[in-house]
């Protein structure tokens, strides 16, 4: 009896916009985790949908009191996060973000409950899927060295692959420290994750599948990167990261998004950081692949090192 592990409470944040076709699957995935629903709150924010997304949510909310629906004017993903933060909607120990077309895996909360050791930020693994079959597992755990826990992170130690929020859990107190995100723009999830990471005192990596990421849904932001405006938005995010001296995540995003990289080459855009990109926190295979891609794709040409200027002024995220 004395050794029984007390159960953590969880908040699931779901931004929703015109996803009536998919949101039922998201809601049911939370219900079907097998975790005590009294210890879960599912915060669903309808970001000005013009379809019947809210009607679908209301039907579930009548049956399941852990579901909380909020409606607001459209301001995109960043606007939803600002709304949740500024209205203090999170009440539980840990929170995670599950977009309305994505899903939580079974037993995900039990796994976090087992492995969390009062860490501020927890990274899990996730599946990329097409809505029917699981495409392939993404083992985030293996992007890092064998150590499970990192404490007191320094800017230069931020690992390369931290720009996806799937399977990521964070303390509510950490979430409330994040500055407002930019509204009406795509790709604010990567910026938010940088904020979380920089403010976390303890980060844990759990080699468990915690989410399903519907990466091939039509009009998914990851599928419209070839759109010129999307390229410019992502470029703006990278320039913001450069201000905070985050060369490694910038490098991995440039490696991953070919169109963005070519745009930077064409327009002679370079990123100035006091440190050069490195992949030292990844395991050997990932580290070798990243270095190879970094030079083979010419990404190394997009960086210019700046000298460190002594200043007492603190940069606030």
Language model feature labels by segment:
Residues 265-317:
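Membrane-interface aromatic/basic loop that binds lipid-linked glycans or pyrophosphate carriers
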Residues 29, 46-55, 99:
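A conserved acidic beta->alpha catalytic loop
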Residues 72-90:
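Glycine-rich, basic loop-to-helix element that forms the pyrophosphate-binding segment
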Residues 148-227:
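Conserved nucleotide-sugar donor-binding catalytic segment
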Residues 107-137:
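Conserved donor NDP-sugar-binding/catalytic core segment of glycosyltransferases
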Residues 211-217, 222-250, 260-280:
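Catalytic core of nucleotide-sugar-dependent glycosyltransferases
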Residues 19-33:
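Short, well-formed alpha-helical segments that are part of the catalytic scaffolds
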Residues 95:
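Short aromatic/hydrophobic "clamp" motif used to bind/position activated sugar donors
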């Amino acid at each position: 009896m004395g050794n029984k592990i007390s159960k953590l409470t969880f908040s699931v944040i779901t931004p929703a916009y015109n996803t009536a076709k998919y949101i039922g699957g998201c809601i049911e995935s939370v219900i079907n985790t097998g975790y005590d629903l009294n210890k879960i709150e599912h915060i669903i924010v309808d970001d000005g949908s013009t379809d019947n997304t809210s009607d679908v949510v209301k039907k579930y909310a009548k049956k399941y009191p852990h579901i909380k629906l909020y409606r607001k004017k459209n301001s995109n993903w960043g606007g939803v996060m600002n709304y949740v933060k500024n209205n203090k909607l999170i009440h539980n120990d840990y929170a995670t973000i599950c977009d309305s077309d994505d899903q939580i895996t079974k037993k995900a909360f039990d796994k976090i409950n087992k492995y969390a050791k009062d860490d501020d930020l927890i990274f899990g693994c996730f599946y990329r899927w097409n809505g029917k079959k699981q495409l392939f597992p993404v083992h985030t755990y293996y992007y890092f060295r064998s150590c499970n826990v990192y404490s007191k992170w320094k800017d230069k130690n931020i690992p390369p692959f931290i720009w996806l929020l799937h399977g990521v859990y964070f303390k509510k107190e950490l979430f409330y420290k994040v500055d407002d995100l930019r509204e009406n723009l795509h790709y604010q999830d990567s910026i938010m994750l940088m904020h979380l990471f920089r403010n976390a005192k303890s980060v844990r990596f759990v080699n468990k599948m915690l989410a399903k990421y519907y990466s091939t849904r039509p009009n998914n932001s990851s599928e419209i990167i070839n759109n010129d405006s999307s390229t410019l938005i992502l470029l703006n995010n990278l320039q913001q990261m450069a201000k905070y001296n985050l060369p490694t995540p910038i490098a991995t995003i440039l490696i991953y998004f070919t169109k963005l990289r070519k745009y930077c080459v064409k327009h002679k855009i370079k990123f100035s950081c006091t440190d050069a990109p490195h992949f030292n926190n990844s395991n050997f295979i990932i580290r070798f692949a990243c270095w190879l891609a970094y030079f083979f794709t010419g990404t190394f040409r997009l960086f210019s090192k700046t000298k460190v200027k002594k200043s007492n002024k603190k940069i606030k995220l």
